[in-house]
Structure formats: C-alpha cells, structure tokens
Amino acid sequence: ADEEAAGFAIVNSLDDDQLSKAIIHPVSPADFSTRYVPRIGAVEYPDVIDLGMPQYRLTDKDRHACRLVRTEPAGIAGSELDETQQAHLLLIVDRFLERHPRPVAEKLQRDVRERGLDKVFFAWAGDTRPKTSHYFRVHTERFLIELVNSIASGDHIHSVIRDFDNDLGGDLLARNHPKPVPDVMPGV
C-alpha cells in the first residue's frame, strides 16, 4: 500500500535526532492502540493480545509505550521533517482522507495544511524493515490514523482513520435532536 511505503520512507530517512522522537517503542502493538472502542478516550492502551494472534503478547511496558494520549501526541512533529519526509507524511494523510466523500476529504486536507505540520505527529513502533512487525500513527488535532502490520512476516495490514469528535458509534441524532427521542413513538 502507498501509505505503508510512505511510512517506511519516512522512518528510514530520519536522522538519529528525528528517530529518537519518532520511534515510540521497538515493539509494535498487535492491533490498533485505540482498539475498537466506540469513542477514543483521553488515554488508550493497546490490548495485551490480539485474539487472532494469541502468541503475540504485549507487556505492560509495551502497552505503556504504545499508548495514545489524546492531548499529547507522541512522535515527531511534521514541521521537524524535511521537505521529502513531509511529502510522504501528507501522502499518508491524503490517502486516508480520500476514503471520505470528496467534499469532506478536500475540506479536511485543507484544514491539515492550514493548521500547519507542527500539529501533525508521526509515531512509529516496531521494526523499521519491510516484512516485519511494525505500526505507525499520524496524530492531528482532529483525527488519528493508525496502520499496523504485526503478523510475523508483516503481510497483513490493518488501518483506520478515526475522528476524535465524530467517531465510531457517535450518535448524531441524539447530539443534534433538541429533545430526546421517546422509546415508543406515539401512534405507532
């Protein structure tokens, strides 16, 4: 996938100072750090195991290192990357945003660029070679991108984009309806 290749291009082009910021842990989580919770909380920890890979276990140290703190992005700010690295970072962002309907994607792409790359963070966990277990995330004020490929040969990608304010399981009707909807509708 273009997104995975761009992630490798970034991490493998970083100098030592950049690497010390970008690599959050030498072990990748088995799956998303945010798991499959309906709304991302203030702090999220990856699961100890993935039911599909019970042999792949994380220690408490691994989980702590790979945790997501919503208000404190881990990794390196996009503004600390060189022009080529920034282009790869924006490619990742754009590819994930292109999963949205075009008007939504274009608005979010503009928003990322207008806010600036100092508000876009790239974090990596795991090995930095293809065909190995690895994970990266792109953390912005508005959304989170996660890509994990932790099966031993690195050949099974899971990826997600999550909106911090309008995420999985969000109840748009309840948030926007002036009165609670009754359990039983009159006359029905």
What function would you assign to each model-found segment?
Residues A1-V188:
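A cross-kingdom marker for long, charged
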